[in-house]
UniProtKB/Swiss-Prot annotation:
Annotated keywords: Cell membrane, Ion transport, Manganese, Membrane, Transmembrane, Transmembrane helix, Transport
Signal peptide boundaries: none
Subcellular compartments: Cell membrane
Transmembrane segments annotated in the record for this chain: 3-23, 36-56, 67-87, 130-150, 152-172, 187-207
HAMAP family: MntP_pump
UniProt main location, coarse: membrane
Family: Belongs to the MntP (TC 9.B.29) family.
Stated role: Probably functions as a manganese efflux pump.
Protein's recorded name: Putative manganese efflux pump MntP
PANTHER family: MANGANESE EFFLUX PUMP MNTP-RELATED
């Protein structure tokens, strides 16, 4: 697996967390740099940790499934990517309705609600739950890493940094531009993961070599 593929995988996996970060920016008022930093640290940290756990589990079973490991990687990435696209399309209308309702809250109540919401949205418990939820896909992808002979340390550092940067920007973007990019990010992430899964399958079955030989 090339560095480019790892970077693209990092972007694909990070899109879920990025979308949630944008949502955080939407719900928070007057976002501060430390708010964005906190969200980014939680999401980036878990996004790096989960592939490591998956890789460890995959290594344990690697000897038993070497003959079809590329199919496992392809199926996992394809399923995860498809799920991201499906959920983004499915939830679009529901989220628009929620935003419309929140816009009707009176100014005074909105300020009071915003202060309470900030504490809740940025609590360690809330961020941990969201960080785990958005990195489950990374856990599954980590299993496929065990069959690809890559440097796991380098890989999780790349994934963690990409997620950290995107989530930091996501909170800022969420405050400035609303929910325009949220579902599009999930769709893009899903497409990237599916394409990488196809690429891994083609590489390991020798189809690419045959096409260009």
């Amino acid at each position: 697996m090339s560095i480019l593929s790892i970077v693209l995988t990092g972007f694909g996996l990070a899109m879920d967390a990025f979308a949630v970060s944008v949502a955080k920016g939407i719900t928070l008022t007057r976002v501060k740099a430390k708010d964005a930093l906190k969200v980014a640290l939680f999401f980036g940290g878990f996004q790096a940790l989960m592939p490591l756990i998956g890789w460890g589990a995959g290594r344990y079973f690697a000897d038993y499934i070497k003959a079809f490991d590329h199919w496992i990687a392809f199926i996992l990435l394809g399923f995860i990517g498809g799920k991201m696209i499906f959920e983004a399309l499915k939830e679009d209308d529901e989220e628009k309705a929620e935003v419309a309702v929140s816009m009707e809250v009176s100014k005074n109540k909105e300020r009071e609600f915003a202060n309470m919401k900030r504490k809740e949205e940025l609590s360690a418990k809330n961020l941990t739950v969201l960080a785990i939820a958005t990195s489950i896909d990374a856990l599954a992808v980590g299993v496929s890493f065990a069959f690809l002979g890559i440097s796991i340390v380098q890989t999780i550092i790349i994934i963690g940094i990409i997620t950290f940067v995107l989530c930091f920007l996501g909170v800022i973007i969420g405050e400035k531009l609303g929910d325009i990019f949220k579902n599009y990010a999930e769709i893009v992430g899903g497409v990237i993961l599916i394409l990488i899964g196809i690429n891994i399958l083609l590489e390991h079955t020798g189809i690419i070599e045959k096409l260009f030989s």
